[in-house]
Amino acid sequence: MTPDRLAAVRTALLRDMTIDIVTLGARSGKWRTTEIWYVVVDGRIYLCGTPGAGEDEREYAPRDWIANLKAHPEFRFVLKESIEETLDARAVIVTDPDERRRVFSADVTGWYRRQTGSLEALVEHGPMVRVDLLGSAAGLDLTMAGTVPPPREVP
């Protein structure tokens, strides 16, 4: 990837919100595409979700995408808003309660808090994956230092 393209990818990562993830099915072994939001907190990319949709919204309901990433952590992170680019990535399931609390407390994850009404439910049950980019995008500086677009707002 050229330096100009890497700069465009960095800008997109800081500005965009909706991506596709292409994962290998945990049980089926088939490639699955899921549209999902991502957030950038403290220079790291995260995929998050609300705990579930049971009788009690705070109950945990498993998600296929997270089951797929647990079984097969390498996946494709597909930018599709301001630019189109497919990035190789590795998922790291976030279990550390301090990291989970820090991410779910960030301004950019306010939508998730509003959906559940409980930071504690998110910390305890919300799906969360840290995304490590691989290949030429590995090591991109996703902090807000330098000239970058303003961060996007999650509705």
Predicted regions and their residues:
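Short low-complexity stretches enriched in small and charged residues
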Residues: 1-7, 33-34, 40-47, 84-88, ...
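Extreme N-terminal tail/first-helix region
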Residues: 1-20, 150-155
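Short, P/G- and charge-enriched loop/turn segments at secondary-structure junctions
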Residues: 6-9, 25, 115-120
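A generic structural micro-feature
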Residues: 13, 28-30, 69, 123
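Short beta-strand segments
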Residues: 16-57
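Short, structured beta-strand-loop surface elements
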Residues: 51-148
